[in-house]
Amino acid sequence: MKSLFKLIGLVFKGIWKAITFVRLALTNLIFLLSIALVYFIYFYGHDTQPQVEQPSALVLNLSGPIVEQSLYINPMDSFAGSLFGEEIPKENVLFDVVDTIRYAKDDEKITGLVLSLRDMPETNLTKLRYIAKALNEFKASGKPIYAVGAFYNQSQYYLASYADKIYLAPDGGVMLKGYSAFNLYYKTLLEKLDVTTHVFRVGTYKSAIEPFVRDDMSPAAKESATRWLTQLWGAFVDDVANNRKIDPKTLNPSMEEFLSQLKSVNGDLAALSIKLGLVDELATRQQLRAQLAEKFGASGDDSYKAISYYDYRATMRDNFDVNADDIAIVVASGTIMDGQQPRGTVGGDTVAGLLRQARNDDKVKAVVLRVDSPGGSAFASEVIRNEVQALKDSGKPIVVSMSSLAASGGYWISMSADKIIAQPTTLTGSIGIFSVITTFEKGFNKLGIYTDGVGTSPFSGEGISTGLSKGASQAFQMGIEHGYQRFISLVGDNRDLSLDAVDKVAQGRVWTGYDALQHGLVDQIGDFDDAVAEAAKMAQLENYNLYWVEEPLSPTEQFIQEFMKQVKISMGVDIQSILPPSLQPVAQQMEQHASLLQNFNDPKGYYAFCLNCEVQ
């Protein structure tokens, strides 16, 4: 009997081993098949390499925002977003757009450019001007540019104005709304919710905290914003009027003049666009395709020979000289925050590390720091500025290229460079500092919630449920005043200005690049190309490569990112994308204000940030 049980046990043991073997084998087989499937999709599952027919038009069909640096999309967020049907939004890196236009200018297969910009959102004028520079270079080569559109928003029309001919749909129009700076204000709301806002600041024009303590824009903030908005709009109008050979007044009518003009064409925006000289011809899609087919040759799909911007980029070859030295490009784009941060945010430790990497690289002979930031953490700004100073002390030239925005903390990280180059429409300055602390003791008490206890120091009981004592408030204000004095002292030392001279142009006031030059805050008016040329000149370089220093992705992250692009996995849901377009600007502004209170992470809570520098 014992032998029988032993035999039965051996049989069951053998069966269990067999089941385990089959289970593991199937699991491993599924895993290997998954790897093989991913490999096949990644390397063979996408379309063949795009080809450029000769001759062809390059269609600049930009979809999505123009950015300084592309973001890394977290794969887990992407997978979660796919459940909601959200697609990956395209991002167009400014320098890629310009490089592509310049590459096409010298490509014999490309005989013209078609601007099809209906999916390009409103974009800052400084970035548009850099693209426009490349469009002018393309035209100078003798190749034509045509703009096509059913309806042009302001940014789309700005680029379209550089075309040789602008087409508009018969039921379309051109809407030029000008520039503005409007904010939401929450003082009364916070009072109704019994939220106490403690504000500490230095600077008459430091208006970042106004939404929390006022119900309207202060006169000082209105004065400052009116000045730089007028300059930006004037630059827009002058550029377009010059391109279209029309009177600038045409682009800046009063409401009465606009209504009178619209009435003269029975409310037809397309007819008004023709009458004012904003466009050249009204054409349906069929008429447009026929005309472009005559210019570039007909294709088999009742259209014209063309290749899209995204397909064309895949055909471009890098022009890289392995024997040449490098000029390193470090991008600081976004709000400045402490520590390591992903792309889209300027991490103090992240950007400082990239600058240090460039400083220690013997092949790098000069550095261009590209700044597009409204500022943020004062502590993180100083971490980056210290590394800029270390680069300068090492003997390697460092030039700052200011993009659309280099204000407050964005100016802080720039001021120690060997040379600062801004465009006329750059917004910079905003030299000031503040702190905001919200406490809820009144609201809690109304709800019947109270805080009580003991502590070992006068600061032990300070918190969101107890409020701030008079002494704590005084300590915060003294710290802010010290931070402001340090800020303007650094500006004075680095810009060779007296403290009085700095204080007169500081106080949180925003300046355009043109005004900043007059006040000694920048050295030169120019764009990114000028900054690179200046860095090369200072380093005595004739031949060089541009080396974009970025936080490296791991091999796994690189693979996942490229794989996601191929299989079109979608990204995480953005609440703004769910809202109607008319509500998205309001949601964006509320999100920005909330992040000011919740997400900023300066160790001391001191911020050099420009909230009112967003142009609408």
Spans of features found by a protein language model:
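Intrinsic disorder and flexible/low-complexity segments
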Residues: 2, 80, 322-327, 331-363, ...
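Charged, glycine-interspersed solvent-exposed loop segments at helix/strand-loop junctions
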Residues: 183, 187-291, 441-535, 539, ...
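Hydrophobic membrane-insertion alpha-helices, especially the h-region
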Residues: 23-42
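N-terminal Lys/Arg-rich, disordered targeting/topogenic segments
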Residues: 1-22
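Short alpha-helical segments and helix-capping/turn motifs at coil-helix boundaries
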Residues: 38-46, 97-99, 313-315
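Extracytoplasmic and endomembrane cell-envelope/extracellular-matrix remodeling and assembly machinery
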Residues: 267, 288-329, 384, 561
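Cleft-lining beta-strand/loop regions that shape enzyme active-site pockets
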Residues: 49-51, 56-183, 319-443
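C-terminal intrinsically disordered, low-complexity extensions immediately downstream
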Residues: 530-562
